UniProtKB/Swiss-Prot annotation:
Keywords: Metal-binding, Ribonucleoprotein, Ribosomal protein, RNA-binding, rRNA-binding, Zinc. Zn(2+) binds at C24, C27, C40, C43. SUPFAM superfamilies: Glucocorticoid receptor-like (DNA-binding domain). It comes from Lactococcus lactis subsp. cremoris (strain MG1363). Belongs to the universal ribosomal protein uS14 family. Zinc-binding uS14 subfamily. Part of the 30S ribosomal subunit. Contacts proteins S3 and S10. The gene is rpsZ. This is Small ribosomal subunit protein uS14. Binds 1 zinc ion per subunit. One of its GO terms (cellular component) is small ribosomal subunit. One of its GO terms (molecular function) is rRNA binding. Its cofactor is Zn(2+). Binds 16S rRNA, required for the assembly of 30S particles and may also be responsible for determining the conformation of the 16S rRNA at the A site. Pfam families: Ribosomal_S14 (PF00253). One of its GO terms (biological process) is translation.
Amino acid sequence: MAKKSMVVKNQRPAKFSTQAYTRCERCGRPHSVYRKFKLCRICLRELAYKGQLPGVKKASW
């Protein structure tokens, strides 16, 4: 889990556009966040397996 102080800090608008970065909206993780879903890879995987993300299915080839 992310530090609460960092999550709160990220909610404020950045002073400059280059300072802004993405965080997972579910857990607050700063790395490997998918912009389309605003979720980190771990949360994305959990919700996809539960079937809670419409249009997402497991790939097989």
